[in-house]
């Protein structure tokens, strides 16, 4: 799992 990409997706959803 790519945590950096996942984090960016989460931040983008906020």
Swiss-Prot record:
Residues modified as Leucine amide are: 14
GO BP, one annotated term: defense response to bacterium
Q: What is its main location?
A: secreted
Q: Give an example GO molecular function.
A: toxin activity
Q: Which GO terms describe its cellular component?
A: extracellular region; membrane; other organism cell membrane
Tissue specificity, in the record's words, reads: Expressed by the venom gland.
Q: Where in the cell is it found?
A: Secreted; Target cell membrane
Keywords of the record: Amidation, Antibiotic, Antimicrobial, G-protein coupled receptor impairing toxin, Mast cell degranulation, Membrane, Secreted, Target cell membrane, Target membrane, Toxin
User: Which family, according to UniProt?
Assistant: Belongs to the MCD family. Mastoparan subfamily.
Q: What does the UniProt record say this protein does?
A: Antimicrobial peptide. Has activity against both Gram-positive and Gram-negative bacteria (B.subtilis (MIC=15.5 uM), E.coli (MIC=70 uM)). Shows mast cell degranulation activity (EC(50)=15-26 uM). Has moderate hemolytic activity (IC(50)=45 uM). Its mast cell degranulation activity may be related to the activation of G-protein coupled receptors in mast cells as well as interaction with other proteins located in cell endosomal membranes in the mast cells.
Q: What else is known?
A: Most of synthetic analogs show a decreased antimicrobial and hemolytic activity.
Instruction: Quote the protein name from its UniProt record.
Output: Mastoparan PDD-B
Q: Top-down, what is the taxonomic lineage of the species of origin?
A: Eukaryota, Metazoa, Ecdysozoa, Arthropoda, Hexapoda
């Amino acid at each position: 799992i790519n945590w950096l990409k996942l984090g960016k997706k989460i931040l983008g959803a906020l």
